Amino acid sequence: MEVREIPLPAATKLAADYITGAFPAESGFAYAQADDEAFCRRLAYLQGRTYDREGLADYLRAYHRRFSASVATMANIEKLRNERSVVIVGGQQAGLLTGPLYTIYKIITIIQLAKEQERKLGVPVVPLFWIAGEDHDIAEIDHVYVVEEGEVKKAAYPHKTNEKRMAADVLLDRMAAKEWIERVVKTYGETDVTNELLFFLSSCLDEARTFVDFFAAIVLRLFADHGLVVLNAGDAAVRPLERRFFAALIERHRDVTAAVLAQQEALRTLGYAPLIEIGRDAANLFYYDGRERSLLQYDEERGLFHNKAGTLVWTREELLELAETNPARLSNNVVTRPLMQEHLLPTLAFVAGPGEIAYWAELKEAFPLFDLEMPPVVPRLQATIVSRSLQTDLSDIGLEVADVLTGRLDEAKREWREATAQAPLASAFAKAKADIDAAHRPLRELGVAIDRGLEGLVAKNAAILQAQIEFLQHALERALLRKHETEWRKFWRIETSLRPNGALQERVWNVFYYINRYGFDFVEKLLAIRSPGNGMHKIVYM
């Protein structure tokens, strides 16, 4: 395995500028850089604060026992009782089979950074993955992408399409899930690893009742030796730990909204468009009745909290009572989730994708409202996997991986198509069209001379003749492409692997395609990638 680096700008302008150092970091973040000096300062800050470490460790120990978590994971949970311990945290939705590769890359970054900082700082550093089990948009996590019939297709797990419960509560039908897994893995092709892979996923499914369970079971096994800890943000059992902070969020909801709106305006003046959609009436919490999440708003005039439809209404006192007596009825939104994370966890650093980097900058002024400080924000690993056969294809057509990732492939395809299928026919068909037009012109003139009312008819007849010639030209072009199909399929393989549906590989393909091809030590190989946190895109040649 060989790893090279290329500069590849992030999709969001703010994240791209933050990674390269062009963004004025003090305008969006508490730490200008996520470097050793920042981690030392952050550690000193954390050691001046208190957390409910016993409650957190007790909850996590009980949760992980459900999944027969590894000795390393259980040991890391116990480390959290140590007043000096800290965590490296990052999170994502609970995608089926872990979703796109970027989720795995985020976990890898968390683990790498935790090991590095534990060695440098001399304190226990726990790698923790925050599973966004509160999310209710199941359509975002119910599928993976596969190649079928020569096309990149979405393979969705069959479930109720109008599902509105949190992912943590959406049950999996074991037989339907097993059949779906087999269908997905079949598209990967049979290898020496396939049976082991199917057994692995079946074993994870045995431990799972819900989408989140399945995700947790998979990542806890994949990273068992590295002591990964997970936190299911949609678990009702974690809500008692959040009760006090829910009350604080209710008390200061107007201040939170005002802080975000003001920060968004400040970023606009710097040329950065905001990502978070938030109105002045936002309460930044959801109410959850076990079936559906309702985003809460605040009616300033009446002094009442309510859902959008106005069918659920609370006074401030009633909502505070709910937070105290039944906190499982509340959950966080995009604004309050990072704040809750900081309340619960002694976070040394937050590992973020490009979108998260951009929207966290919008939250800068919300943290101080609760005497919190935004942690250092570390960009996750960004990578593209290149197989040996794909390296040959790239060499044959004269392209580098960087060319493909920066959009050069479409131009190369067009040039090849023109040279291979269009150029050899172009002059012959241009002459044929001109000759037919010349032969037809006297007939058009004769028709119009006989009856001017025939002008439209003769013009249409001429167009039909030209269209038939173009039809024949396209048919011959397709025949030439078939003749050169071996060469054409190189373009298809490159595009499908590196730029599927025009997106980055890490945003489409799933880790188990690569495990099926390279074995379970594929994940260990990724963990061995030295990731200096310089924001460069890693090209991993297998």
Swiss-Prot record:
Annotated coiled-coil segments of the chain: 458-487
EC numbers on record: 6.-.-.-
InterPro entries, per the entry: Bacillithiol_biosynth_BshC, CC_BshC, Rossmann-like_BshC
Transmembrane segments: none
Keyword Ligase tagged: yes
MF (Gene Ontology): ligase activity
Domain of life: Bacteria
Keyword annotations of the record: Coiled coil, Ligase
Biological role stated in the UniProt entry: Involved in bacillithiol (BSH) biosynthesis. May catalyze the last step of the pathway, the addition of cysteine to glucosamine malate (GlcN-Mal) to generate BSH.
The family this protein is said to belong to: Belongs to the BshC family.
Protein name per Swiss-Prot or TrEMBL: Putative cysteine ligase BshC
Upper classification of the organism: Bacteria, Bacillati, Bacillota, Bacilli, Bacillales
